[in-house]
Amino acid sequence: CGSCSSGCPASGIGDMDPRKFLRMALLGMEAEIAASPWVWFCSMCMRCVHACPMKINIPQLVFYGRQQVPREKRPKGILQSCDMALKHDTCSAMGASEEDFRFVVEDVLAEVRETQPEFRDMEAPIDKREAILFVNQNSREPVTEPDEMVPLWKILYLAGADWTYGTKGWAAENYCLFIADEPNWEHIVRTKAKAVDDLGCKVWLNTE
């Protein structure tokens, strides 16, 4: 019916839209789907599923379409981010190590305490055992925009939340999902889940 295409952010890009993509899949045009760059334009936001009266999961088809592309030919940026996340148990797509993360968090926290007296008692715990919340953080903040971590700390502090980061599994992003690399996607999720379990936290709060 085309409802899926009406609200799709990627509709019309590369002469493709969700309805056309679905029809191609129905007609068995796997080679054409795999050759189309549109599988990488789709953000898999699920808006088409919400609009579809039959609730057809087009993003799942997009995911399968991505898997038809040889791994080395998938988009270089997210491919490298996936591979980088596999180098450390931090799961950071920017390659930040456990030591890097701890240094940045402690340095930024010290500055906030010194310059903002109303937050002199604020904490940004790392590896606190049996905290209620295990909080993930996107790698971009500690690596390139460390001050952007502070608003979340303030919210958690003012809410009286019992929370912690972990030196392992702290990175919130998972580019292996977007590259449609299921084994490594699962590896990263399991690494993060183990970090939560090892600290005895009750809730994994993924900020992505």
What is the predicted function of each stretch?
Residues 1-41:
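Ferredoxin-type iron-sulfur electron-transfer modules and their immediate structural context
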Residues 25-206:
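Iron-sulfur-cluster electron-transfer modules
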